[in-house]
Regions:
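Conserved metal-binding segment of the jelly-roll/cupin
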Residues: 73-87
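His/acidic/aromatic-lined binding-pocket segments of jelly-roll/cupin-type domains
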Residues: 42-45, 80, 91
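A short beta-strand-loop-beta hairpin characteristic of the jelly-roll/cupin
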Residues: 48-71, 111-116
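Short, small-residue-biased leader/transition segments that mark boundaries at the very start
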Residues: 1-8
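Short connector loops at helix/strand junctions that flank enzyme active sites
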Residues: 12-14, 37-39, 47-49, 67, ...
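Long, intrinsically disordered, low-complexity Ser/Thr/Pro-rich regulatory/activation regions
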Residues: 114-127
Length: 127
C-alpha cells in the first residue's frame, strides 16, 4: 500500500494499519486543534463511502492564524496522505460516523504527535 520509506523518518518504528472511527461534525465545522507528526507520514481512506473535510497548513513553523489554513472537501473515493511534518486537523467526518483505514507510523522513539490548540481563532468551515 505505502512503502515504509515513505512513512518513517529516522527514529525507527514501522508502518501500521488501523481503523479509526470518526464522529460526524455538523456544518459549519468548528476547528479546535491542528497537529503534525514529525517522524512519519499518515494516510487516510474512508471505508464507509462517506465524504469528509480536510484541513491543512504548511509543514514547518506553527501556523499563526486561520489565514494559514486550507480546507478541502474530500469525496469518499479519495484518500489523503500527509507528509511527515504537515500540519492538519484530525479527521472531520460529515453526516454520520465513518470508519477510516489509517496508515501510520507505530512504535519507534520520540513524540510523534505535536498539537496546537486553535480554539481562540474561532475557525469554522462550511461548504
Amino acid at each position: 500500500l505505502v512503502g515504509s520509506e515513505m512513512c518513517i523518518r529516522d527514529s525507527g518504528g514501522s508502518v501500521g494499519l488501523s481503523i479509526f472511527l470518526a464522529q460526524p461534525r455538523a456544518l459549519p465545522a468548528v476547528l479546535s486543534v491542528m497537529e503534525y507528526h514529525p517522524f512519519g507520514s499518515q494516510a487516510f481512506f474512508s471505508l464507509d463511502k462517506q465524504d469528509y473535510l480536510v484541513v491543512v497548513a504548511k509543514a514547518g513553523d506553527d501556523p499563526k492564524s486561520a489565514d494559514e489554513l486550507h480546507a478541502f472537501y474530500a469525496r469518499h473515493d479519495q484518500g489523503v496522505q500527509y507528509h511527515a511534518g504537515t500540519w492538519h486537523h484530525p479527521l472531520l467526518a460529515l453526516n454520520q460516523v465513518c470508519q477510516f483505514l489509517v496508515v501510520d507510523r507505530v512504535g519507534g522513539e520520540g513524540i510523534n504527535c505535536i498539537e496546537l490548540d486553535i480554539n481562540e481563532w474561532q475557525v469554522q468551515v462550511e461548504f
